[in-house]
Regions:
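N-terminal "domain-start" segment that seeds a small globular fold
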Residues: 1-19, 37-39
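Thiol-based oxidoreductase modules, predominantly thioredoxin-like and allied folds used
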Residues: 55-72, 87-99
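Conserved helix-turn-beta segment immediately C-terminal to the redox Cys motif
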Residues: 24-25, 33-34, 38-62, 81-85
Length: 179
């Protein structure tokens, strides 16, 4: 199975086939405009502007599962992302990325990667403690743990890497490797 077999909901509620992105390197992520990690939008936009002409796309899926609930519509989330952070990459309808109601795309992404921790910074230890409160066995499963978890998909449609929100330093190297 490849990413191209999935359909997702666009901002307008219509189905979007990921086969529309055949041949592109994709960075698929979950986000929340009110997240502590929302500052990453600026760096992600910089990467998008730098590599988009080389067959690189970022696909952004807003998500309310990690305590950063935004009560507005999908369109309001999009406008906030554009106004606050200058986002120009594609955004889709709000989704669940883990649990019973997770969309098939994120189930597949999670099942085909593994969680490798949050790193070793002081913030990483705090995040681990917070995530453990929700899932005592969080280290033993590949579920998405936080907003701004990113999955890198190669040009053939297969997921090749996963980046936790604390892992921005490796991200550009990963993108370059698959372009």
């Amino acid at each position: 199975m490849s990413v191209y077999e999935f359909k997702v909901k666009g901002l307008d509620g219509n189905d979007v086939s990921l086969s529309d992105y055949t041949g592109d390197v994709l960075l698929i992520m979950n986000s929340a405009v009110e997240s502590d990690f929302a500052y990453q939008y600026k760096e992600l936009e910089r990467l998008y502007e730098k590599y988009n002409g080389n067959g690189f796309e970022i696909l952004d899926f807003p998500c309310d599962q990690f305590g950063n609930v935004f009560r507005g519509t999908d369109e309001e989330i999009h406008h906030l992302s554009v106004d606050r952070y200058g986002v120009t990459f594609p955004q889709f309808s709000r989704v669940d990325v883990k649990g019973k109601y997770a969309i098939p795309l994120f189930k597949w992404l999670s099942q085909n990667t593994y969680f490798d921790g949050f790193g070793r910074s002081p913030r990483s230890f705090l995040l681990s403690r917070e995530v453990r409160k929700q899932d005592r066995n969080y280290r033993d499963n590949s579920d998405v743990k936080l907003d701004f978890t990113k999955f890198l998909v190669d040009r053939t449609g297969y997921v090749v890497d996963r980046f936790e929100p604390t892992d921005m330093k490796r991200l550009e190297e990963g993108i370059q490797r698959y372009l």
